[in-house]
């Protein structure tokens, strides 16, 4: 049983070190046994006899003893040799054992070192093979990716080419408009988002928030302009893509250029339609002004244009691009800020555009045409003996001598630092003396039409090099019967320097073309005839005050109740037909509700307010401009800075709290000289605007509702204390 139990014991596995140790022990035991057996063998051999005693001196010599002595000597020598050989063999055997043991130890150490070295070499070889394998895999993956990229690029190029061919021969498919389900369209939203907060429009604190006054850096804030950074990053990414395409050998196709141009136009349109109201235009630099800021600027100064390729107006004298001498003269004359007509006309005159200015007397129009005229003359050679016989460089005509002399004084004042000679030719003075002044040479002639024509007919003056003409108060000159004289003077000028009638035609850089300024308070038919004959692609600049800007707008004010507003609104829109109309509300919630009601009533309506995204605003405005929608329900976001042409009717569904907001709202109609209609629903809750509204209606000769005229709030300005009636009107009651 014990042996069976021993046989069932589990085998014991030895490590490499244990096996080496066990082998060494076994070898040591074998060597020890071998030595022990050799020693036993030596001990078993017979010992040699002890050496004989030394011989005595002079021993007896006989033959037998010498023979015995010789044999014993031989035996002794033999034994000695045998012992010596045995010791030598034993030492040799011992050395051999030591050498074999040393060799075994050395071989064992060598084997151990070789095995570890082989292990290290094997591991290093494995690592090298793995590294080479990974490098090869990466190269293959990179090659596969590059191949896939090139295949995809080639596939895209083929698809673009096929699309271009299909579009050329089959025509492009018109994108289908996504139909919105009524359940999604009229889904009620229970919460208002933070972006729909209208407190910015109502609270002045939100309109001018406090900003950090940092003393370093430039840009939006301390040199960090997020919008500018996005533009720079987009431009850098575009350049990187173009460089990659050039390295890959891919040429830009016209289709790609068209796509890039379309994207650039879209980006420019987005920047121009910037609806973010962060600062007023007075707090922005010239580069930061957006299209909306320029529209608000023009509305603030009641500047309107009619024409093509109109430059931006100037906001201050430092932005006028006038010469240093002229700016010094302007500063010396005490002109701190330019007037609206100067803001609009001077940039046009510096571009030598023909201008028709409609402005009242005293609006500063003299400087509006004198400064560009002097800037033009400074670019010409000075008048000398060689060219003084050819006449002046510029002519200004005025209807009366008083006005001509006034213009002369202003011109001399502005030409102080230029050395330009100015001569006036008016009636009541000697014509010979005036002709003598002209023959002496002058750059500018200021005259009345009749006297100037007399000088031309008598050969006192010529206009061979006159290329700058100003007609001040042209309508008044026509009314006074000076039309033939004006035509005669204009015909006396060389006609070869007239600009081509087609404004797209390229102008000759070496030719000096005529520039004509015409200022008039009105545009009668005779003035229009002059403009059509002598002006080339003129820009009409209209300047007027807020009250006069509303003369073209018929204002209707209806006193009503809140419950009657919607029915009245639907009746007005029904009578209007397909003509565009804008309905103004005070809040975004009210605008959405009114739009929903009008949509249910069958009107094509869209909304515009601060709660909409940039894309939604553009879509709404484009749809309204393109007549896909006939009604635009908006808040005061559309009241300023947004130009919507041909608006036939403006309806104030909810009256604003200030008269300025009311003025800007109704200013959406009656634009560009066209007549417009404005209707306002007034309730007894709008008492804050009663007084100012009544005054505006009276000034514009519009009907005032009896309820508004009799109301107590319309008799006194809000916040003022009414005067006490005279004491004589008091009734005194006697007491008994």
Swiss-Prot record:
Gene Ontology molecular function, alphabetical: ATP binding; ATP hydrolysis activity; mRNA binding; RNA helicase activity
Motif Q motif per UniProt: ranges: 315-343
Gene Ontology BP terms: mRNA splicing, via spliceosome
Reaction catalyzed: ATP + H2O = ADP + phosphate + H(+)
Broad class of where this protein is predominantly found: cytoplasm
Recorded coiled-coil stretches: 14-38, 137-167
Domain Helicase ATP-binding, residue spans: 346-541
Keyword Nucleotide-binding on entry: yes
EC number: 3.6.4.13
Stated family: Belongs to the DEAD box helicase family. DDX23/PRP28 subfamily.
Protein's UniProt name: DEAD-box ATP-dependent RNA helicase 21
Origin organism lineage: Eukaryota, Viridiplantae, Streptophyta, Embryophyta, Tracheophyta
């Amino acid at each position: 049983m014990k042996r069976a139990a021993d046989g069932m014991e589990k085998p014991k596995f030895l490590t490499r070190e244990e096996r080496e140790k066990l082998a060494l022990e076994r070898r040591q035991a074998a060597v020890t046994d071998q030595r022990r057996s050799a020693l036993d063998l030596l001990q078993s051999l017979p010992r040699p006899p002890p050496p004989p005693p030394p011989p005595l001196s002079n021993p007896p010599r006989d033959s037998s003893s010498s023979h015995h002595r010789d044999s014993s000597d031989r035996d002794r020598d033999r034994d000695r040799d045998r012992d010596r050989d045995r010791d030598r063999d034993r030492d040799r055997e011992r050395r051999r054992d030591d050498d074999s043991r040393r060799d075994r130890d050395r071989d064992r150490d060598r084997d151990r070192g070789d095995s570890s070295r082989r292990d290290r070499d094997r591991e290093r070889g494995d690592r090298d093979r793995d590294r080479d394998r990974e490098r090869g895999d990466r190269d293959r993956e990179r090659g596969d990716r590059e191949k896939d990229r090139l295949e995809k690029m080639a596939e895209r190029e083929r698809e673009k080419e096929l699309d271009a061919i299909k579009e050329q021969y089959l025509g492009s498919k018109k994108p289908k408009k996504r139909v919105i389900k009524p359940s999604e369209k009229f889904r009620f939203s229970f919460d208002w988002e933070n972006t729909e907060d209208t407190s910015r429009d109502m609270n002045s604190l939100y309109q001018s928030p406090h900003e950090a006054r940092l003393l370093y850096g430039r840009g939006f804030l301390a040199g960090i302009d997020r919008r500018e950074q996005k533009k720079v990053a987009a431009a850098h990414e575009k350049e990187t893509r173009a460089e990659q395409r050039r390295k890959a050998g891919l040429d830009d196709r016209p289709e790609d250029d068209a796509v890039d141009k379309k994207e650039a136009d879209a980006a420019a349109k987005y920047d121009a339609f910037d609806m973010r109201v962060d600062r007023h235009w007075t707090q922005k630099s010239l580069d930061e002004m957006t299209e909306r800021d320029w529209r608000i600027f023009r509305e603030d100064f009641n500047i309107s244009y009619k024409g093509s390729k109109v430059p931006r107006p100037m906001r201050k004298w430092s932005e006028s691009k006038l010469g240093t001498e002229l700016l010094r003269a302007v500063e010396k004359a005490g002109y701190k800020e330019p007037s609206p007509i100067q803001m609009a006309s001077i940039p046009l005159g510096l571009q030598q555009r023909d201008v028709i200015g409609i402005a009242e007397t005293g609006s500063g129009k003299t400087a509006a045409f004198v400064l560009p005229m002097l800037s033009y003359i400074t670019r010409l050679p000075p008048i000398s003996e060689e060219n003084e016989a050819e006449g002046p460089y510029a002519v200004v005509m005025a209807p009366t001598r008083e006005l001509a002399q006034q213009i002369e004084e202003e011109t001399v004042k502005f030409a102080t630092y230029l050395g330009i000679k100015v001569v006036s030719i008016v009636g009541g003075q000697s014509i010979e003396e005036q002709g003598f002044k002209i023959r002496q040479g002058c750059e500018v002639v200021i005259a009345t039409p009749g006297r100037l024509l007399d000088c031309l007919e008598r050969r006192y003056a010529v206009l061979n090099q006159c290329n700058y003409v100003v007609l001040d108060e042209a309508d008044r000159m026509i009314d006074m019967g000076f039309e033939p004289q004006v035509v005669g003077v204009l015909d006396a000028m060389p006609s070869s320097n007239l600009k081509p009638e087609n404004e797209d035609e390229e102008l000759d850089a070496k030719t000096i073309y005529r520039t004509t300024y015409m200022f008039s308070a009105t545009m009668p038919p005779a003035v229009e005839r002059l403009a059509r004959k002598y002006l080339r692609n003129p820009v009409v600049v209209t300047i007027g005050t807020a009250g006069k800007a509303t003369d073209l707008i018929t204002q209707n004010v209806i006193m009503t109740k809140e419950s009657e507003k919607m029915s009245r609104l639907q009746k007005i829109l029904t009578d209007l037909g397909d003509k565009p109309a804008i309905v103004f509300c005070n809040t975004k919630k009210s605008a959405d509700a009114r739009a929903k009601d009008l949509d249910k009533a069958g009107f094509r309506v869209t909304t515009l307010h601060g709660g909409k995204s940039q894309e939604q605003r553009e879509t709404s405005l484009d749809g309204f401009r393109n007549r896909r929608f006939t009604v635009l329900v908006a808040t005061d976001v559309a009241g300023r800075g947004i130009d919507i042409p041909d608006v036939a009717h403006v309806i104030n569904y909810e009256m604003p709290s200030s008269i300025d907001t009311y003025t800007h709202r109704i200013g959406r109609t009656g634009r560009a000289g066209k007549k417009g209609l404005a209707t306002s629903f007034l309730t007894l809750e709008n008492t804050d605007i009663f007084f100012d509204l009544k005054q505006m209606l009276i000034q514009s000769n519009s009907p005032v509702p009896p309820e508004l005229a009799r109301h107590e709030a319309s008799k006194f300005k809000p916040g003022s204390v009414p005067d006490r009636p005279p004491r004589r009107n008091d009734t005194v009651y006697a007491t008994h």
